[in-house]
């Protein structure tokens, strides 16, 4: 699954274009490396996501097939680290 679509489906970005913008700006990394928004993500991948106010590192546990409700999104990833900036 493309990283921009994954971020949208897991409610980690409001829109797919916002997710793509975050990836392009370097705010989203996979395994510590900068990627393109077309990067295919698989289970077990480690994502580093930087927001203006916080940074989180997550491991993808399962790939969603469609948009996930906010209350259920954390069953698809595991938070490794989270810190406020």
Residues of each region from the PLM?
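Strongly charged
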Residues: 1-5, 9, 16-21, 27-85
